[in-house]
A protein has these predicted regions:
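Glycine-rich phosphate/pyrophosphate-handling loop used in enzymes and phosphotransfer proteins
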Residues: 1-140
């Protein structure tokens, strides 16, 4: 049986304990079940240009660790796992045919140069392909 390392608890696990696996990393069922999930998607009440945002999970200590590893420790493979978690969440909503684009949060040019990638764009690309909605890099970080 193959093994993977859970990105949340950093433990080496047998593949039959996984909620998701991507190569040698994954998310064990125990960690996935203990993530603080949001109750529902709610409209963003900010501007006329952003009608809707959503997040499947609360930004807790464990989620923060994974996101920071993705952003600052060159753990780009984490983006696929986070996107797969987002896909599971999105399947419970039937609103995607009304969306024109998936737009990732822009990264400042300085950060992009330092990091070499935009973690939000990596996740958005996976989600856009899954939903068959074009991804658009139209926001500018100011």
């Amino acid at each position: 049986m193959s093994k993977y390392i859970c990105v949340f608890c950093d433990e080496r696990k047998e593949s039959d304990t996984a909620h998701l696996i991507n190569g040698k990393i994954g998310i064990c069922r125990h960690c996935f079940e203990n993530l603080d999930k949001t109750a529902y998607a709610s409209p963003y009440q900010g501007t006329e240009h952003i009608a809707f945002t959503m997040s499947p999970f609360e930004y807790t200590k464990s989620m923060r660790k994974v996101i920071l590893d993705l952003k600052f420790s060159n753990c780009k493979a984490y983006a696929k796992l986070l996107a797969d978690m987002m896909k599971d969440y999105l399947d419970s909503y039937d609103i995607w045919d009304t969306f024109d684009y998936i737009v990732p949060v822009p990264l400042h040019k300085k950060r992009l140069k330092e990091r070499g990638y935009n973690q939000s764009e990596l996740i958005a690309k996976e989600v856009a392909e899954y939903l068959k909605i074009p991804m658009r890099l139209s926001l500018i970080h100011i």
